[in-house]
Amino acid sequence: YVDDSNYMNPQEWHDKIVQHNVTIWNSVPALRNLYLTYLKENGKVYKESIRLSLLSGDWIPKEMPEDILNYNKKEQIICLGGATEAAIWSIAHEYKGLETWWNSIPYGIPLRNQKFFVVDENGEDCPDWSQGKLWIAGNGLADGYLEDSVLTNQKFFYSKLHNCRVYD
């Protein structure tokens, strides 16, 4: 493990990756970017033991997956998302290359036992490829907020249209 005094030090991460042949990277995109910048600025060799990158917790810059693959073409990149109120990870996109028409890395498809609905301001399903807000449903939903029934009732409710409880 990286000790508390070095948890934001990419040199320390690199040393641990090399020392322990780390195979999985799991972080927010900003930390991954910090590591990639460290490698580039210091002429460090990327440890190809990393076979899987899990990126979540924030928007993933469009160029980041390609930056990773420039170091290791065999690395699998999974972009994850969701809400703390819904099992933290509830949607995933396996990166297979950048499409020129993308404005951003796609949010992905629901993980097993999870559902996503893109709805309008009336809670009606939006047509494919249109904007709306996301409702999350499935086995990963929390019961609600501890000792906050008002917020729980605002954010968690039953959707008659979808015949299930959702998180807004």
Residue ranges of each PLM-predicted region?
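Short, solvent-exposed helix-helix connector turns and helix-capping sites enriched
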Residues: 9, 39-44, 147-148
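Conserved AMP-binding/adenylation subdomain of ANL enzymes
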Residues: 1-23
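Conserved AMP-binding
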Residues: 5, 84, 138
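Alpha-helix capping/helix-boundary segments
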Residues: 30-32, 60, 141
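Activation segment
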Residues: 3, 26, 35-36, 64, ...
